[in-house]
């Protein structure tokens, strides 16, 4: 593995470079944490013909136990089809790569603080954000991005094992 140069350029509305920076990354740097590539298995649900020019969407399991991964995959497929049932996604379906990340929790469901229910799930999600009963979020973003470490993604959809509608 060789050192690589990362260049970032910021453009204005006229496509002129306003600012730029370069950074070199040595893969053997002691501050780069090695991860277990098999920590969270994933399944490609839809593969576009041109993977270099597609939008990568990752469905991430939250509150599904290892025994419930079949249910998670079914829920992911159902959510994927629901997205593609609507314009403009219907006609652009071949531009999307969809992956389901099987991040198993030890317990099923999600926390509901207003009901006194706190669960230790893989992403630590919970309802009642900002005291809104349907507002579901997680503060454990590092865990979320660690679960996605070996999966290319542009957009993240966390599927929570609950029948209650929520989002955040």
Predicted segments, located by residue:
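A broad, low-specificity signal for short, low-complexity segments enriched in glycine/proline
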Residues: 18-19, 60-62, 116-121
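Aromatic-enriched hydrophobic runs in primary sequence
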Residues: 6-13, 21-23, 72, 84, ...
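Fold-level signature of zinc-dependent metallopeptidase catalytic domains
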Residues: 32-85, 100-112, 142-145, 150-151, ...
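Short, low-complexity, polar/charged sequence segments that are solvent-exposed and flexible
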Residues: 27-28, 76-79, 117-121
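Metzincin-family zinc-dependent endopeptidase catalytic domain
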Residues: 90-168
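Extended acidic/polar, glycine-enriched regions
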Residues: 1-51
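A common structural microfeature
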Residues: 3-5, 54-57, 95
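Helix N-terminus capping/helix-initiation residues
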Residues: 26-27, 65, 134, 140
């Amino acid at each position: 593995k060789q050192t690589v140069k990362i260049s970032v350029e910021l453009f204005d509305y006229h496509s002129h470079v306003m600012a730029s920076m370069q950074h070199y990354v040595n893969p053997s740097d002691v501050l780069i944490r090695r991860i277990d590539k098999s920590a969270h298995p994933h399944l490609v649900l839809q593969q576009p013909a041109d993977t270099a020019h597609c939008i990568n969407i990752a469905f991430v399991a939250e509150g599904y136990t290892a025994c419930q991964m079949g249910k998670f995959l079914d829920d992911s497929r159902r959510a994927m089809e629901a997205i593609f049932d609507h314009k403009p996604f219907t006609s652009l379906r071949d531009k999307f790569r969809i992956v389901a990340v099987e991040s198993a929790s030890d317990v099923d469901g999600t926390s509901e603080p207003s009901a006194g229910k706190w669960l230790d799930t893989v992403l630590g999600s919970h309802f009642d954000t900002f005291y809104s009963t349907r507002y579901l979020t997680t503060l454990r973003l590092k865990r979320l991005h660690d679960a996605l470490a070996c999966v290319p993604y542009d957009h993240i959809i966390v599927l929570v094992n609950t029948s209650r509608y929520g989002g955040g």
